[in-house]
Amino acid sequence: MTTVAHAVGTALARLGVTTVFGVVGSGNFHVTNALTAAGARFVPARHEGAAAVMADAYARVSGGLGVLSVHQGPGLTNAMPGITEAATRRTPRLVLAAEATAPRSNFHIDQPALARAVGAVPERITSASAAAADLARAWRTAVTERRTVLLNLPLDVQAAPAPAPFDVPAPPAPLPPPEPDDAAIEALADALVAAGRPVFLAGRGARYADAELTHLSERTGALLATTAVSRGLFRGNPFNLDVSGGFATPAAAELIRSADLLVGWGCSLNMWTLRHGALVGHDTTVVQVDIDPDALGAHHRIDLGLVGDVATTARATARELDRRGCHSAGYRSVKIAERLAREGRWRDVPREEQPEAGRIDPRALSAALDDLLPAARTVAVDSGNFMGYPAMYLDVPDADGFVFTQAFQSIGLGLATAIGAAVARPDRLTVAALGDGGALMGISELETAVRLGLDLLAVVYDDEAYGAEVHHFGPDGHPVEHVTFPPADLAAIGRGFGCAGVTVREPGDRGQVAGWISGPRDRPLVVDAKVTRGQPSWWLAEAFRGH
């Protein structure tokens, strides 16, 4: 007898699922086994929360669907931070969760309500006869609408005989991306023609439109910038400002603030990207292009909003400019290019050292790592006071090389994010940049990294504190003993899991890291970097101004 659980798992593999993350319990045992029997790879994590984050990172880096398999009740609740991160970011994700529907079961919770509460879409396999249609609907929503879908699998339905044949309708062909009407394109072209200092700001929605935006920027003389999550999109372009917002270099911030036209492409223009509005000049015309009409003007005032796919809109605008015969140098000049070559990276910005005995400046650490690491790298960054250093000092080869965990601003997601990214791109060395607080929250997944044989470097910026809280409240005289901790030997903990482990306290210690990078890299390396603690990072100081 073929059960519904077996039929669902087999059908998912036939639909194209190749990789599944999760933790197996009795409720998701059979559907997971069916997936692997049909050819999918199952990546078992040590905790459901980590598995959820791995699936999110895998989807973001691979460009495919992330799939998570969890037990009913506590298996699902354990996974909620990662599910919330994905739902907030609108990562295409299918969560397979067993469901105890008996009200008196100790596993019973309102799982659909839980999904809705965090922005995910709840679906359910309602019966054996409807299972194929229910699965097709959940799949279609996840893939075509780029949503995180919780597909509940009631235990009794899973065990029921599946109808034969179990035919899941093929997903419909994707609809053509929306394009603004002619009047909107003409209005954007008018704004570009009138601008003398245009800046293009590309977000997550522009991830696959780099060629179109680069071409349009060359026609209009626009400088290029990205949100943090899209860092690397314009790497190598001499007019690339890198990241806007709190992470922006002084040169980038000045040039963005001086723009007379700011066009946001597939980005929300939120407080982080615009430094609470400080990067928008009083006379700057603001345009926003987004596929979601509700996103237009949601965070910042705009003068023109266009509902459309970024690549499609950029191509249409370029055609309109071609029709008009318009071409402008705009904001671009030899002087600007030379300035960006000198000042375009944070490591090129002069800094005062922060000496502290037995501790290394996180900026010096990050710059040294950038020099040591191979160019083919993926950088995954956890949340915390430290995060600007690896985010902006470690270069990345492209937008797929940077994975940021800030949609929900939960700490402790960095290591699992790196693992998911490493599974998606095993051809690149993956760097997990962590604070000590986040590292200790997710440290059990070091065993997963070892077991999978991942090419992974975990760098812990260890200030023995929740540094953001120390720097936020400490200067006002508040006690900070609840957010500071005694020293821990994180390198030794890493070795206990089977990793290599080194402690870095000064620049000379980087030789141990260099040896691992140039060696066979047959096991992950944990670097416990004891960083200086005297001042908040520059991005945190900017964030405090908005609180």
Spans of model-derived segments:
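Active-site diphosphate/adenylate-binding microenvironment
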Residues: 5-8, 16, 23-26, 31-36, ...
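Conserved thiamine diphosphate
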Residues: 67-159, 256, 267-288, 424-485
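Glycine-rich phosphate/diphosphate-binding loops that line cofactor/substrate pockets in enzymes
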Residues: 7-17, 57-63, 87, 141-145, ...
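Thiamine diphosphate
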Residues: 104-106, 247-249, 256-258, 297-299, ...
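N-terminal cofactor/phosphate-binding cores enriched in small/glycine residues
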Residues: 2-84, 88
